[in-house]
Amino acid sequence: MIDIKDLTMVYNGRAVLDNVNVSLSQGQIVGLLGENGSGKTTLIRILAGLERNYQGDVSICGNRPGSLTNDIVAYQPDHLPLDENLKIEEVCSVYSIFYDDFDSNKFYKLLNSFEISKELKIKECSKGMKEKIQIALTLSRKAKIYILDEPMSGIDPKSRKIVLNTIIDNFDYQGLMIISTHLVLEVEKVLDRALFLDNGKLVVNESVDDIRENHHMGVEEYFTEVL
């Protein structure tokens, strides 16, 4: 579904991505892990079609990221600017107009699972509630690939388990999901594969099962050791 060959991106004389090569097939939840400044967000923005000034080849279902992949990829940035004065149900209506593949019924089902009222205005929601709304909006698209950038950074630890269970319950294994996060311990239980970025270089690309079997440690411990 995603093929990346010799991907390099230089910004202000610094390689924020340095000769990255990786192929990702369907049926996986992939963790994109790395410290701040490692290149995670840049890679995600390239896959979302928001960054074009790079060298190398990037293919999503045979197409270069951009207008031809907008219906394939559902992208959730680390901060989604929502009109603070809109009610949640009005945001849902906007998404229904903007995305042909948006499922309003699914959105309200997810919203209910998070115990959030559709009558609330965005400005009445906490940071954690806003992130849950963003997750519900993203998962309610009928996309082939879902890319979530730090989806739980503002969610309290107790609610993270609920969010992760929601992600698992709504993941179609005919598709692909990439979760970029620094919360390695929380997400490792849902991951099939882990990618570690360090200073723009892809230093680890292994299945979670192989990490546990070959290195005799969990993803977080391995992440700490490698980086």
Walk through the language-model features, giving the residues of each:
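Catalytic Walker B motif of ABC-type/P-loop ATPase nucleotide-binding domains
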Residues: 146-150, 155
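Conserved ABC transporter NBD signature motif
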Residues: 55-69
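ABC-family P-loop ATPase nucleotide-binding domains
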Residues: 78-133
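Helix-to-loop junction immediately C-terminal to a conserved catalytic motif
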Residues: 48
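Conserved structural motif at the start of ABC-family nucleotide-binding domains
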Residues: 2-4, 17-19
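The feature captures the beta-strand-to-loop junction immediately N-terminal to the Walker
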Residues: 33-35
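ABC ATPase "signature
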Residues: 205-206
